[in-house]
Amino acid sequence: MIEPHAPAPPGAAPPWGGQSRPWLPVRPGVGRFFVLAGVFVCAACGLVYELELVALASYLIGDSVTQASVVLSVMVFAMGIGSLAAKRLRPHAAAGFGAIEAALALVGGSSAMALYAVFAWTGDWGGVWAGGPRCLLVAFSLAIGLLIGAEVPLLMELIQRIRRQDAGGAVADLFAADYVGALVGGLAFPFLLLPLLGQLEGVLLTGTVNALAGGALVLGLFRRDLTRRGRWLLIVVNLVVLGLLATAAVLVDDFERAARQAVYGRDVRVALQTGVQEVVLTGGTRGRPLDLFLDGRLRVSGHDERRYHEALVHPAMSDGRHARVLVLGGGDGLAAREVLRYADVARVDVVELDAGVVRLARRDPALSSLNAHAYDDPRVHVVTADAFCRLRHTRSAYDVVISDLPDPGITASTKLYSQEFYGLVSRVLAPGGRLVVHAGPVASRPRAYWTVEATVRAAGLRTVPYRVGGRDTGFAAGPDRSTDASRAPRDWGFVLASRTGPALSLGPGGPRLRTLTRASLAADALDPGRARPPDVAPSTLVHPRYAD
């Protein structure tokens, strides 16, 4: 983005010594158009670099709000510093602009691979190395911001060399080209680059376009401003940058496989980008347990998923009617598997945002075997939608609602743990209906857990909190790799709720369970009077309270 630059006062001599307009290979109007086109392209590339850092940092480090704040604030600050620093380059605006664009193309184009590499190979070292991705994120934000900020004073000089105009008009033209370019870059990143190329290849292509645009503008329009040696030096620098970016593009698939193995181990079997999230499956063959990762977070582990899903589903299914069941999330089909063990279930609606996860749960032999081919059962109906939006528009009533969603500390899921969300759930509960919520680990994140419980109560439901221990797998990848090992979750927390107050029990006529018994369930009930912190407030859409 452009930082304002104060132009020379009206009537002041031009900085190149008061000479007449320099020689140009085209008419002044055409040359001015080319400069503004360069501003447009560079602005688009600059915004792609910003968005790429925010997106990758949110995936690797977590908490998208914090990462966006860090990247944008550091980058805008650095842009101001870069604009001031570029004053010294104004007498050599063409050479300076060419060098800055080459550096920006290299730094911005390589930023995603460098950040991913540091995360993959040092993220689990612990100690000072655990903060490596965060430090590198700040460093890239600072470097890219400095280079972007240095562009505009130089572009102002170049456009004034072509044809002198009043300061306000020059600034307006530059800002217009910059903001339109930023719009194009901002829309191209989520709708073209990410779906078609992914983060790594997308930003490499952006760096290539950046280098070509900057080099072509200087060498094509202002080559007479450079010495012969300067022209050749700029050509060599740009060729080196383009060669490095091209080499990275050729090796990006091998790099991504190696980095993925460093994060997930060497047993990666499926890795795909669905448009909603990255989905990785490991194991599931030759007796090895299956693990499902969503955006780097371990979502399902074959080691202990049975304990989790039995504790999630069966207490809610054991007390009252359960002919109609709504599963929010749970695209892996494992919650539906447990629901379908009750013969009198007439319909199961699964509301899942990511159709790719459902497709994988249907087709992958290991995952479909683990969920007992739940999606082949005619009683199961899948709705691809955001759970919040679906609840706002549905008028159906359900005997049981199962909230099998990502942990509440993940920013993208915060609205699905809000008072407004549970108010919508309460509206679709049939008389005597029950809600069960996966509320995150109790031992390692007690405040987040009790905030969920307080939020459900604030929606007008009576709650019974409980937990299940014996969790064998803690955080293994993604943002959670940097979590202190002492806080790795070893339990799951749940909240059972209804309008009248549910009973935490297992019915006598229920299916035979492998891990959950009446005695263990009774022992795992939590006493709110003793365990609940005294000052926990409910979370709302406008005031989320799940940050630790």
From Swiss-Prot:
Spermidine binds at H309, D332. The chain crosses the membrane at residues 33-53, 65-85, 102-122, 136-156, 180-200, 202-222, 232-252. The keyword rRNA-binding does not apply. It is found in: Cell membrane. GO terms for molecular function: spermidine synthase activity; thermospermine synthase activity. GO terms for biological process: spermidine biosynthetic process. Gene3D superfamilies: Vaccinia Virus protein VP39. InterPro entries: MFS_trans_sf, PABS, PABS_CS, SAM-dependent_MTases_sf, Spermi_synthase. Residues 249-487 form the PABS domain. SUPFAM superfamilies: MFS general substrate transporter (SSF103473), S-adenosyl-L-methionine-dependent methyltransferases (SSF53335). PROSITE patterns: PABS_1, PABS_2. It catalyses: S-adenosyl 3-(methylsulfanyl)propylamine + putrescine = S-methyl-5'-thioadenosine + spermidine + H(+). The active site is at D404. GO terms for cellular component: plasma membrane. S-methyl-5'-thioadenosine binds at Q277, E352, D386, A387. Keywords: Cell membrane, Membrane, Polyamine biosynthesis, Spermidine biosynthesis, Transferase, Transmembrane, Transmembrane helix. Residues 230-488 are annotated as: Spermidine synthase. Its EC number is 2.5.1.16. Pathway: Amine and polyamine biosynthesis; spermidine biosynthesis; spermidine from putrescine: step 1/1. Residues 524-548 are annotated as: Disordered. Homodimer or homotetramer. Catalyzes the irreversible transfer of a propylamine group from the amino donor S-adenosylmethioninamine (decarboxy-AdoMet) to putrescine (1,4-diaminobutane) to yield spermidine. Belongs to the spermidine/spermine synthase family. This is Polyamine aminopropyltransferase.
